[in-house]
UniProtKB/Swiss-Prot annotation:
GO terms for cellular component: sperm flagellum. The modification Phosphothreonine is found at T168. Residues 10-265 form the Protein kinase domain. This is Testis-specific serine/threonine-protein kinase 3. It comes from Homo sapiens (Human). The active site is at D134. Activated by phosphorylation on Thr-168 by PDPK1. The gene is TSSK3.
Amino acid sequence: MEDFLLSNGYQLGKTIGEGTYSKVKEAFSKKHQRKVAIKVIDKMGGPEEFIQRFLPRELQIVRTLDHKNIIQVYEMLESADGKICLVMELAEGGDVFDCVLNGGPLPESRAKALFRQMVEAIRYCHGCGVAHRDLKCENALLQGFNLKLTDFGFAKVLPKSHRELSQTFCGSTAYAAPEVLQGIPHDSKKGDVWSMGVVLYVMLCASLPFDDTDIPKMLWQQQKGVSFPTHLSISADCQDLLKRLLEPDMILRPSIEEVSWHPWLAST
């Protein structure tokens, strides 16, 4: 793999991330004269569903997306031994999960600045007919003051002619909407909105809104509604947005367009 990438102008560095069927490595691009990230996907190591269904979707989707708050893919390479390499923009600030883990809850103004960018990225995706389906703090990367979404491994292009209803569980349990956990036919875009609510909650509280160690208990908590630690003094507008994002009834949950108009995001 190292020789293959070197022959294509990339000097491999350290591993900066690891997925079920992939690794992300830092590299130096001689062509671009800068550091890049290379996601190495092992086609031979994954199950048939991943190879036949999810991987082709990811490769199709990342080719088409172009937004300042989405990690850019520069090039795709495939080695003779079935490894696919996605050469991507490198975000050197780590991810939101590590930021909160190391620094604690973010000030509301900082969370708002980052969350606005996530809203813009998802608004763009949904406008392109793409649902991410795996939004979580680990997939929100930081580059200075900018947030950039990554990992479209579970993403799906939605039909334009009618509303798509999915029954597939994708992503991480802690960030999954109640209808996704219950296997009810659901709108994947509304699932993204719920996951964004969990991301915002983690940014502000440095904890998850619901206990993901016990799924029946988690579903009960979700129906009961989100509560906030009193010592953090989260503003009324922000609490209102979080309650809307984490609305257990997907019909009542706002679309990404409606989220973008919320007073908390409009205020400075």
